[in-house]
Amino acid sequence: MWLTSYVLPRLKNILLLQFHITLPLNYLVLLLLSTVIITYLFLRTRILSNYSQLKDDVSDENNINRKDYMDASSASFLLNREKHKGFTSYLDEFLSAIKIFGYLEKPVFHELTKSMKTEKLQEGEIVLLDDSVGFTIVVEGTLEILHKMDNRHSNPSGDAAANATAFEPPSNDDGYLINGEKFQLLNIVKTGNPLSSLVSIMKLFSNRSTHLNEGTHPSTTNNTPGPGSPNLTGEINSFLDSTLPAKFGSADSANGNHPISPMELESTFDNLSEASENDRSAKIPDIIARAASDCTIAIIPSSSFQRLLVKYPRSASHIIQMILTKLYRVTFKTAHTYLGLTNEIIFTEFQSINKDNLKLPEYFRRSIISYFTNRQDDTGSSASTIQKRPQLHRRDSNNSLNYGSRHVVLNSRDQYNPGDLLSNVPLPRLNPQQRNDLSNTNSSSTLSRADYRPIILNNFSSSQFEETEVSSWRLALVEIIFQQLGITKDTIEPPISDDFSLHDHSLDEKGLVRRSSYSSFTSLSSSIATHSSNHLVTFLPRESQQFSRLNRTGGKMASHSKRLNGSSRSNSRTDRSESFDHFRNENLGGDNQFSDFESVKEDFSKCIKILKFEEGETILCQNSNPQGIYYLVSGEVDVISETKDGNTDESYERTLYTATEGYILGYLSSILGCKSLVTLKVSKGPAYLGLIPYNDLERLCDKYFMIYLKLSEILTNSLSPNLLRLDYFLEWIQLDSSETLFNQGDPANGVYLVLNGRLRQLFYEDADSDIVTQMAELSKGESFGEVEVLTAIHRLNTVVAIRDTELARIPRTLFEFLAVEHPSIMIHVSRMVAKKAMLMNFKSGIGFSGSQPITKLIGDETAMQKRYDFNLNIKSNKSSKKNELISNTVNYKTLTLLPITEGLPVEEFAYKLINALRQCGKTTIGLNQRTTLSHLGRHAFNKLSKLKQSGYFAELEELYEIVVYIADTPVSSSWTQTCISQGDCILLLADATCDPKIGEFERLLLKSKTTARTDLILLHPERYVVPGSTSKWLKNRMWIQSHHHIQFTPMEKVAEPDPIPNIKPLSQLVEKFKENTKKTQENFVKFLPDSIKTTVETLSGKYIDPKPNPKFYTSVDPIKNDFLRLARTLSGQAVGLVLGGGGARGLSHLGIIKALEEQGIPIDIIGGTSIGSFVGGLYAMDYDLVPIYGRVKKFAGRVGSLWRMLSDLTWPVTSYTTGHEFNRGIWKSFRDYRIEDFWISYYCNSTNITESVQEIHSSGFAWRYIRASMSLAGLLPPIVDNGNMLLDGGYVDNLPVTEMTQRGCKIVFAVDVGSVDDRTPMSYGDSLNGFWIVLNRWNPFSKHPNIPNMAEIQMRLGYVASVNALERAKSTPGVVYIRPPIENYATLDFGKFEEIYQVGYAYGHDFLQHLQEKNELPPIAGTTTSAYADKENMLQRRNSI
């Protein structure tokens, strides 16, 4: 009752109580508060958030355009597949086959083809391939090349062979039984390819036994199985030539060749002499061709080549030179670099010229040494080279009375020469008739020691022709070299045939008969003139040239020819015949007659140099350019072959033989114009050598062009059977630009070796799709296709030619033959292929694409490295990469400098680039139109120029590592088109201050449809890039793969003074006001503190006197030379710097960079993660340490400010902060700069948590992607880019070294500042109590380690991929790993800037100094002082912020 009467009413009153709170709010205060809020929002959104207004409006468009461009390029390759599948005629296939001869003039072409015939072959018919057949071409169908197996390798027993039919395929699909002999299939020749080998073509010119009027026919036999099949009588002709040497090149003495005795062979080639006597006497394998289907072959008989040699000897010499060049590139180069047959190549050289070791007479040898010593004593110089000349022989004293002599006065007398015996030495000289008789009996070979006779000049009176001592041994050296090489007077003269008019009597065309008769009396005229000059040369050696020339151009022989021809040539000759006569006169040598052999030797003797090398010195290094032909006067020289060990990449030497007095060295490289295959080192010295320099040798051989015929004859007669076999079965292939070699899915029937040019490998994901992935680019010296051939699978990709390319094809069947007959060669190839396959797996596993040594995979892994699986890396998203085509194996052989428009200083730029490339250790040569025209000479504007150009360019690529083509001609010039077609990489030069419109040269580039890599070179007058200007150049140029900023001021613009402007009166007042304002400011600033003073100066420079184009200084440090940086990048020797993430610990990056600069280490590419991306981006932007120091310190102060962080806090749903202050701090450092505007190449990475991939950023606004790379999860929100959320790149790769190696960096300095992983073993059982964890942390006596909390576990989980990537980076070859001692600093210790900076600098300085002292610092190209360094006028400034 009490409850209801007392409590309830009071409770009701309490609930009905009303409270009134009055807060007086003045209208003015409300207005002020609203103003503050609105102002804050306006400042934050409009002014403080300017960075958010920067829209990347061209990023997506660039990506789409680049992809479309690449797809279009791939589509052009697809269209090219059908390019050669249309209708082709016999003529097309014939012209394709004779490309091996090079360009042929019309008369030469007609001379070769007028006797050509075709033969129809039915399936199964046999063609015997020997020299009598001539040059054979397959114009329709397919032929199989078969090789007779030795009995040692024949499996069938004698009874089985006896019971076999005339033609029976054995169990092996690639073998046949013909008349009981087993033949192995080595190659399949298809339509448009020649059956004749390179050696057999040269033999068509050198085979003097073939009669010019003898017709030759192929020996064909129908070998279809059946009792009626005719048997092959006798043995099939031996391989190429029955007179060739057997196993080791020993020739039949009946042919004038004198084999090396077994004792000599054992003393020079131990490895070759180990073969048994049976091997030496074994017959050379026979070669035949079998028609695999009904086919047609075209045959140019050997008589056509002999007629060509008589009528057009210079053209024949050109063909021989072309074949010799291809013999080296196809056969010798494949044998040397791929099959490891260097020994046999050097043995070929030995057999060619050193079989008969002709020593210089002792008195000449001592005279040379004495004269050389006296010259050094007189001049007081240590130079080891003097110019001299040689003569050639020693004389049999028993026959000295049979020859004429001339007296030579010698100056040297010593204790070995009693009295005056050598004061008046008679030199033997044969008279012309004796010399001709001698040379005719030994024209095809050098003389043996027993048959040795000196080559004698004319029998002149000793009183008229008394020689000095120097000229005597110069002529003696020349004569000995000539004798060794088999060069005689008949050798240098074009061959003359007395029955030349009989060749074409069977022809019915009157024009041809008339031309033939004209040629006959011309040849007869030349023959009579030659005989006349031979009789007159004894008395009038100088006038004989004029007389001989008179005979060939008219004079007395004209009347004789009129009697032969019945009409006057001078009255009946037409304009066409005049042109024909001019061409023939050029082919006969023009004014250079060959009758005076003494003048030839005189020309060679003028070029002789004498060199002296001490014991142990190197005369010639392997892979160096040819220096010329050496003759060893005194001493001994080791011929050494250097081979690299594939496992350790170290080279080891092996002495092939030791050359003694009388040996000729450097012959093969000088004749073929190739790099030396061996090293020449003095083993017993001092060694004196006579040298005919390479340039002089080339000039004289071009003058006396018939020398090439003799040299080719000696070379072909000395080839070993293995080289002959290779020559016959290696196929030379020529591809035009954008032509497809083979398509993906084609049968793998051969291995290819790139001889010249460049190819690209493409992979199609689907046969019906145009989606293409570029796999790799292949350049000169690289091979491909081995894996498919050895595993018998189809082609894994499509290969297309980027530019005109030459290749050597090794058939699959040849591999199988080598496996049976030469297991050692096959083992060598198998090791190389296995190594390549291992490297491919290694690259595909960890993302590498470059050819790096596999040092970390073979036997040297540490226990820690074995714990990590390098295949667990998270690959980058390729669609985000702008420079998708960056090649990691930068091995450009040719560079093209092409201006975008007229007026750019291309030649000056080329001069500096070539000097920089040379400073980087690359042998480089530049070609412009002027130098090329001077080489082409009179052929500059005729059809022969294309042939001479291609040969000239190929020769330069052999001699130099990089050839730079300079497009210094107008856009309509053919030279500009040539430069575009020859470039592996095209450098487009553009003036960065001009309008970025498409230039006329770019239109020509697009019209040429080249697929070569194209880089843009932006030339700046100062080291400054206007923010955003680079993207204007790139956004409309989808064909650009990369760009480079280069400071370059043309020399003609340096001295130009600035124009004096006309100042108007109003302008004068403005200038006077500014001057007074400046004085007032200076007086006012004196009374301000330093902090305010800096702000006033900044505002004054920004608003009162702004400079639209600020001047930036150029560093005087040579390591920052832009041309050296470009040269290292283009030559694959770039130096990269990778800066890892680690928060405040990354401030030590600044000290590491300072230490690198002090050590003289240049940086060409920079990459980074998190704080490393920030510091690296600042350095890449200015490429100088001074300005970035202040910016990094300012940023550290902003991030370390507690008040700024508190003002940026937000509700912690996604992150604790909004990210505004962090964004603004980064933006204030980079402003509106884009990554493309950075002075040196730069990239950073981030983690795409939307697509779960790693993003690589190398374009776009710098602040945005650097902010993405620094976005620590939980502290900062992710950055959104095209709908993808980007976080800190350290979660996937905290040290992105892999991307750096993919960009072609040879040396990478990787700085790791990440936290150290806690690898303490844990042991707490199968369950875990949280209270125990807390007590364990507080218990100081506990033996259990601290258990990580949930946050630590999540962090470790996020960094699993990064730890694996870090271990992979440490084991990457070429990486210098740097880890400063910054473990005591936390991630957010930005307030300790100076301390962390000094720690990084001190450690970097000591670390690099330690590497240098231990000689472990990798050599960096371009860092040594060079004579090529340019001294430029540079703008300087003081070292201040």
Swiss-Prot record:
Residues 572-585 have a biased composition (Basic and acidic residues). Residues 1137-1301 form the PNPLA domain. A motif (GXSXG) lies at residues 1168-1172. It is a single-pass type I membrane protein. GO terms for biological process: lipid catabolic process; phosphatidylcholine metabolic process. The lineage of its organism: Eukaryota, Fungi, Dikarya, Ascomycota, Saccharomycotina. A motif (GXGXXG) lies at residues 1141-1146. It comes from Kluyveromyces lactis (strain ATCC 8585 / CBS 2359 / DSM 70799 / NBRC 1267 / NRRL Y-1140 / WM37). Residues 376-388 have a biased composition (Polar residues). One of its GO terms (molecular function) is lysophospholipase activity. Coiled coil: none annotated. Its EC number is 3.1.1.5. It catalyses: a 1-acyl-sn-glycero-3-phosphocholine + H2O = sn-glycerol 3-phosphocholine + a fatty acid + H(+). One of its GO terms (cellular component) is endoplasmic reticulum membrane. Keywords: Endoplasmic reticulum, Hydrolase, Lipid degradation, Lipid metabolism, Membrane, Repeat, Transmembrane, Transmembrane helix. The gene is NTE1. Intracellular phospholipase B that catalyzes the double deacylation of phosphatidylcholine (PC) to glycerophosphocholine (GroPCho). Plays an important role in membrane lipid homeostasis. Responsible for the rapid PC turnover in response to inositol, elevated temperatures, or when choline is present in the growth medium. The chain crosses the membrane at residues 23-43. Its main location: endoplasmic reticulum. This is Lysophospholipase NTE1. The active site is at S1170 (nucleophile), D1288 (proton acceptor). Residues 44-1441 are cytoplasmic. Residues 1-22 are lumenal. Residues 154-173, 210-236, 376-445, 551-585 are annotated as: Disordered. InterPro entries: Acyl_Trfase/lysoPLipase, cNMP-bd_dom, cNMP-bd_dom_sf, LysoPLipase_patatin_CS, NTE, NTE1_P-loop_dom, PNPLA_dom, RmlC-like_jellyroll.
